[in-house]
Each structure stands twice: as structure tokens, then as C-alpha cells.
Amino acid sequence: HEALQLMQHAEEDWQALLREWLNAILKTGPVAQTKWVEEISRLGREKQKQFLRYFNHLLEQAIHYRIMGEKLNIGEKERDFAERLNKIAGIEQQQAIIEELDRASYYIERNANGKMLFHALTIKLYHIIQDKIVFLVD
């Protein structure tokens, strides 16, 4: 029971952190983005990778929800988040974000500087969402 509570608590923390990040990217701008990057940089590599996996999971759910609609069996919070993600990003953008998150996770495993990585990721996500740009990588 305690492990389940810890998991739910961690998920709520991740969701709050993700909401903060997306708001910084889309609404509040550079000062909030820098503050958020400072915050995630303090978490350590494993937590950073967990956060990226969590965001990836939500993006995959959003894509499934877009395709399956009400038939998809997900929780109320996840459904709400999926609907919001689907409003701000199309499938191509969501897939591009998933690829960027996977790449970031890979770089974290290889000792990338957390601050630089999350600053760059923030800028990439801004352009993917706002400008509907998908980065093509070899």
C-alpha cells in the first residue's frame, strides 16, 4: 500500500513539474524556463530520466486517446492531460517530442550537462509546438 502511495505521489509531482514546464515553454517565457531548468537540474540523472519517461508515457497516451477516443481506458487526470496535449500538438509534433525526449534520456545516460540539455530541450519543444517545426536528425 505504501509503495502505491509513493508511486501516486511521484506521479502527481511529475505532473506538476510537467505542467510547470509546458506553461514556461508556452506562456510565461524565458525567466520561468530558466527557473524550471534550475529546478530539474537539481533532481539528479535518474529522476530526470524518470521525468522524461513519464512525459513520454503521457504523450503516448495522448496519441492513443486521439485515435481510440472514449474507448481508451485511462484515468480521469490522464484523460484531461491527453485532451490538453492533443489541443496544443498534432500527432507529428507529439511523435517529434517523444523522439526528442528519448534522445535527451540517452544523453543523460552519457553524462550530458543537465542544465544545457534541458535548456536546449525547452527551446526545441517551443519550436515544435509553437512553430510546428519538426527537427530532422540523421
Predicted regions, residues:
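Charged, glycine-rich active-site and insertion segments that engage polyanionic ligands
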Residues: H1-Y54, L58-D138
